[in-house]
Structure formats: structure tokens, C-alpha cells
Regions:
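Positively charged n-region of N-terminal signal peptides that target proteins for export
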Residues: 1-8
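Conserved N-terminal structural module of periplasmic/extracytoplasmic solute-binding proteins
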Residues: 23-180, 184-202, 247, 265-266, ...
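Conserved small-residue motifs centered on glycine
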Residues: 388, 392-520
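Short, solvent-exposed loop/beta-turn-alpha elements that line the ligand-binding surface or hinge
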Residues: 126-144, 187, 191-194, 254-272, ...
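Short helices/loops that flank or line small-molecule/ion binding pockets
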Residues: 87-99, 113-117, 212-220, 300-315
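Extracytoplasmic/periplasmic substrate-binding proteins
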Residues: 239-260, 281-441
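Helix-loop-helix "hinge/cap" segment bordering the ligand-binding cleft or interdomain interface
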Residues: 154-242, 258-306, 315, 369-381, ...
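C-terminal motif of bacterial Sec signal peptides marking the signal peptidase cleavage site
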Residues: 18-22
Length: 556
């Protein structure tokens, strides 16, 4: 949404009276602790820890934070918004003028105009220095951020996009895909082994053509109806991804696409998207998508719970390492499952064009932003810390801890110490380390999500099977892309990040309403004809105005 905000004389006037009108919350002298160290108030959603992974909230009281405090002459005071109300908490903080020195917000295309861009205009957040040459590691990371220019306003960048994986910046596809019950496929093949005319449904390396995928689903349906005793179903999607079948048809992932002339159009009314909806509708009619999918909600997490209980054959979700590991752990507790690898195998489906299809993604997620009123000294300290944590030395501190106590380097290899890394006595495999708070790792999340060190993080060892499965799938998709066998479904960047008055305000509404109408059309409740679906989607009044504004900007 590259936008030129032409403040002109008005901006000059505003800045001249910034003490009266600036929207940052904490103008005035910097504060210091009893040791004379500069106090930094930093907020990040990842500081909140994780109940699922038994990780407590980061409070800044650990040894490694103190090492950073001493190194940089600061006193770090971390806080975290609630993950469940992250956007609302940050927006309320900014509106209420209670912004910390550093804030973390889930900036994305659909909320760009009503958050980031608006906060720049109101002088709530501060631009990064034009010259980042003093922070070479940070500069190197930013050089690889996708669509970085879209985030610049008048040539300035107002925050740090948090990189997904600084070791793999070229990955432009999401982890939103299928897992399936390979053990069901094996069982079905075994049941039919005596039939000389039977063709096995299980495919090598879990790769299925479109026809083979449909045959697999129908075989699962027969299996569920005739063999299973529980309330089993065939194919389920996370509600935000329903119907996932459209991925193999649509040319854009969400609201906006381009027609042959380059005009912006409503993606939900294109022939490609409707063809995908109607294919999904046929899956509903055939019982491949269950009736209960219609009632699934993100709040209740129905789809995850269904698959985790062992009651579904195929599941579509965002399979990050964390999400995939969580699902594996849940299935391991199921006494009816003998082999968890077979219960949660990655299902690789090729569309009718012979290609895999995955939604595209930016190579970053959310942004670290600075209070407009933060002093230059404070801002530079935060940038110094981030740059250090992106260095080899800082990364080692984040991953292993303190050299000489937590680990030693022997023959150029890191060797963990027993004092620094205590094994969990309850894990008979000997792979699990007792969790310890490491502020360096937490603070590093202000710049990157830590996927660059997952393969050598000691904590990964306890979930090495999950990590191996996810990385193997990712590498296979990267190879498929290189070979021209992966279609990455991207929204054109000039549409995605474009800023117009109605688009800024209405995109989330357009997305939610259009997807809801798509679900109603798939289930014919109540939209039982294509005409009714089209009328419902086009009837959302903001569509016409939004597209008109966008095409005016495109000169179409």
C-alpha cells in the first residue's frame, strides 16, 4: 500500500507544535534505574509465553536479559498484549496515549490503512533512521523483506517487519496445506488386498494427482460409513480456510484479483473462484465435506479438535512447526493410533493443471514499531540490541545461553553443559530439556521469528520428528516451485498494499462477508443458486466503491 502522504505546510505546522499535538504518549526526559541504566519499555505479543508449550511469560528477570542490560547500559521492562485480543489491545493503547517505547502490531494488507498509515499520519509512531549503516545485521535483514517499499511512506519505514526466517527469505508460500490419515489409506488397501482388480489408493511419498485425491476422499467416505464406529468425517478445513478446494482453482487468495485488462476485480466473483466453490459444493453433496463444517468456528477450534481426536481423514490448517507439533502431540495420546507419522502425514495434492497449489505469503509477519516520542538515545539502544541479537554472537546467546556456563565451543562445535541444560527426568527418551527463560531469545522476536535456528535449537530435539516432517515438506515444495510444479496463489502486490479510503475501511468486511456467502453457497444454506450467491456478494455496498477507487489509482 505504498502511499504518498503529502503533508506540506500542514506537516511543518504540526511539527512546530508537536508538544501540543503529537500523539506519542511519553514525551519528556528519559528515565533510568538505580544503577543509572536507561529504562526501555518494550511490548511484544511473543513476550506473553505459551500455555500450549508450557512457556511462561517473559518478565525480564532472567540471567540473559541481565547480560544484555549490562552490555548496553539499559534496564529492559517487557510487557505483552493478549494474543487473543492483540490488535484491539494495541489499538486501544495507541488511542489511549499509553504506548510503550516499542510496540508490536499485526500489520497486514487489509488493516494497513486503518492502523500503520493512520498512525504515521497522526504521529503516533516514529520512522526508522534513514541511515541504518550502524546496524548492519538489521540492514541486511531488511534488504530481504518482501514488498518493503509498500511499507514506506514518503520514503521512510516506520517500523521493523519481523522476518519469518532470515535464513530462507525467498520462501513466498505459506504452510497452509493438508495432512491426512495415511494409516486409513493403508487399512483400506489391506481390506481390498484380495481383490485382483483393486488399485491401491495409497501413493508413493503421499503425492496425489487430482483424480487420485478425489478417489482417496471417496474411499475414505466408504471407509467411514462402513467400517468406523465413531462420528468420523472425511475432509475438514479450519474455518478461515474453507473451502480449501478453491486453492486449486482461484488466481488470487482473497479479495482482489486482476482481469485480463489489468483492472481490479472482486476475486470472489471470478469464474475461477466460483468453479472452486462449485467443486467444494459437490464435495458437500457427496458427503466428503461434513455438514458440521458449516457450523465450525475459529473460536471453538472445532476442526482442530476433530482431527486431534482421530475423527477426520484429511485436515487443512496452517502447519507451522508449532502447529504441526501440537497436533502430533495430541494424536500421540490417542490409544487407537499406533503410528503418529501415519496419522498426520503431509498430503501433497496436484490440481488438474498438474501443479501443487499453495497460498502465497509475505516473508514477514507483523511489525515492531517505535513510539513517536521515543528519544533518539532510546531508539538507538533498541536498534543496537536488535542488531546484536541478529549477529552470530547474539544468536548463540539466544539459542544456547552464556558461553562458559551453558555451553562451550570444542573443535568449532557447540557442546552443551549439564549445568546449563538440565534434562527433563520425566522424559525417558532423554530428548527433552527443562525450559528456562532466555530473554535474548524473547527479545530477538522483535526482529525475526526464530525459524533460522530451529534445526539446531536444543529444544527442537524433543520434537525432532515434527521438525523433520515440516522441513521435508517445505523443501519438497521449494523444489517443486523451482521445477515449475508449484503454483503460488498471490494477490497482486499493487492491489494488496494499495491504499484508498473505502478499501482501508472495508476490506475486512468485504473478506468476511464474501467468505461467509461462499460457505452458504457450498452448503446451499440459504444461497442455493449461483445467481443468489453473486447477488449476495455484489450486494455488499462497499465493493463497487472500493473497486472504483482502486481502478482510478491504477489508471484503468
Amino acid at each position: 500500500m505504498k502511499t504518498k502522504l503529502l503533508y506540506g505546510a500542514l506537516l511543518t505546522a504540526l511539527m512546530s507544535v508537536s508538544s501540543l499535538t503529537a500523539c506519542g504518549s511519553k514525551s519528556g526526559a528519559d528515565k533510568y534505574d538505580k544503577k543509572g541504566r536507561l529504562i526501555l519499555e518494550l511490548s511484544n505479543v511473543y513476550f506473553g509465553g505459551s500455555n500450549e508449550e508450557s512457556i511462561p511469560a517473559y518478565d525480564g528477570a532472567d540471567t540473559y536479559t541481565e547480560l544484555i542490560n549490562e552490555r548496553f547500559g539499559v534496564s529492559i521492562k517487557p510487557t505483552a498484549p493478549s494474543y487473543g485480543s492483540w490488535d484491539e489491545d494495541v489499538s486501544r493503547t495507541i488511542t489511549g496515549r499509553s504506548l510503550k517505547d516499542v510496540v508490536h502490531y499485526n500489520v497486514k494488507a487489509y488493516n494497513f490503512g486503518t492502523s500503520y498509515e493512520q498512525w504515521v499520519r497522526r504521529m503516533d509512531i516514529k520512522a526508522l533512521p534513514d541511515d541504518l549503516s550502524s546496524w548492519t545485521n538489521l540492514q541486511s535483514m531488511l534488504n530481504n523483506i518482501s514488498n518493503l517499499d509498500a511499507l514506506k511512506i514518503n520514503g521512510k519505514l516506520y517500523g521493523i517487519p519481523i522476518a519469518n526466517d532470515i535464513s530462507n527469505p525467498g520462501k513466498d508460500f505459506s504452510n497452509m496445506t493438508y495432512v491426512y490419515r495415511r494409516d486409513w489409506a493403508k487399512a483400506i488397501d489391506e481390506l481390498n488386498a484380495s481383490n485382483p482388480d483393486y488399485q491401491p489408493i495409497l501413493k508413493e511419498n503421499d503425492v496425489y494427482t487430482w483424480e487420485e485425491f478425489e478417489r482417496l476422499l471417496r474411499a475414505f467416505k466408504t471407509y467411514v460409513d462402513g467400517t468406523k464406529e465413531n462420528n468420523d468425517v472425511v475432509l475438514i478445513d479450519q474455518p478461515w480456510g474453507f473451502p480449501s478446494i478453491t486453492n486449486f482453482y482461484k488466481s488470487a487468495p482473497h479479495c482482489f484479483a486482476k482481469d485480463a485488462s489489468g483492472r481490479a476485480v472482486n476475486n470472489f466473483t471470478t469464474n475461477e473462484y466460483i468453479a472452486g466453490l462449485e467443486k467444494a459444493q459437490s464435495f458437500v453433496t457427496a458427503g466428503l465435506y461434513p455438514q458440521e463444517q458449516f457450523l465450525y468456528t475459529e473460536e471453538n477450534d472445532n476442526a482442530y479438535k476433530k482431527y486431534a481426536a482421530g475423527l477426520a481423514g484429511v485436515f487443512y490448517d496452517n502447519f507451522s512447526f508449532t502447529n504441526y507439533g501440537k497436533l502430533r502431540r495430541a494424536l500421540k495420546k490417542n490409544k487407537d493410533i499406533d503410528n503418529v507419522d501415519d496419522a498426520v502425514a503431509f498430503l501433497k495434492v496436484k490440481g488438474s493443471d498438474g501443479k501443487f497449489a499453495l497460498e502465497g505469503t509475505e516473508n514477514w509477519f507483523s511489525m515492531t514499531m517505535f513510539n513517536y516520542d521515543i528519544s533518539e538515545k532510546k531508539m538507538n539502544k533498541v536498534l543496537d540490541i536488535i542488531d546484536f541479537l541478529l549477529s552470530e554472537e547474539g544468536t548463540r546467546l539466544a539459542v544456547y545461553g552464556q558461553e562458559g556456563y551453558d555451553y562451550n565451543v570444542v573443535d568449532n562445535k557447540v557442546v552443551l553443559t549439564d549445568t546449563g541444560w538440565e534434562k527433563d527426568p520425566n522424559d525417558l527418551s532423554g530428548k527433552t530439556y527443562i525450559y528456562k527463560s532466555n530473554g535474548a531469545k524473547s527479545l530477538r522476536y522483535m526482529a525475526t521469528l526464530g525459524n533460522d535456528y530451529k534445526d539446531y535449537d536444543p529444544y527442537t530435539e524433543a520434537d525432532i520428528e515434527a521438525y523433520t516432517a515440516v522441513t521435508t515438506w517445505q523443501n519438497e515444495m521449494k523444489a517443486a516451485k523451482t521445477a515449475g510444479n508449484l503454483r503460488v496463489v498471490q494477490e497482486p502486490a499493487d492491489l494488496s498494499w494499495m491504499s484508498t479510503p473505502t478499501k482501508n475501511e472495508a476490506t475486512e468486511k468485504l473478506l468476511n462477508k464474501s467468505k461467509a456467502y461462499g460457505t452458504q453457497y457450498c452448503y446451499k444454506q440459504p444461497l442455493d443458486t449461483r445467481e443468489k450467491y453473486m447477488n449476495a456478494v455484489n450486494g455488499v455496498e462497499e465493493w463497487a466503491t472500493t473497486l472504483s477507487e482502486m481502478n482510478a489509482k491504477l489508471g484503468k
